[in-house]
């Protein structure tokens, strides 16, 4: 299963770590605006690669949104326009 994680901070990074440990995801794709979070996730092996949001959503079986709720509301229409009935979107949004 290919998993895209949008947001690699505390929540998204923890989800990526646990998915990597269990082997449930064959490929993990990260979408992250903070270059330090992205670099750390790649160095720790939490994600296999980074893609832009549109590409990452299209490539995934499971999309995890782990960003603040206001940011989810901004990107959700684009995400939902790109998914098929074979993909799942999970909201792990946090308020800040």
Predicted regions and their residues:
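NAD(P)+-binding Rossmann beta1-loop-alpha1 motif at the extreme N-terminus of oxidoreductases
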Residues: 1-58
């Amino acid at each position: 299963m290919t998993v895209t994680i949008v947001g690699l901070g505390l929540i998204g990074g923890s989800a990526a770590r646990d998915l990597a440990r269990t082997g449930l995801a064959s490929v993990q794709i990260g979408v992250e605006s903070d270059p330090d979070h992205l670099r750390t996730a790649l160095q720790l092996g939490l994600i296999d690669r980074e893609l832009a949001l549109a590409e990452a959503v299209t490539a995934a079986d499971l999309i995890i949104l782990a960003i603040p709720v206001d940011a989810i509301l901004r990107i959700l229409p684009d995400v939902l326009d790109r998914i098929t009935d074979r993909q799942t979107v999970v909201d792990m949004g946090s308020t800040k």
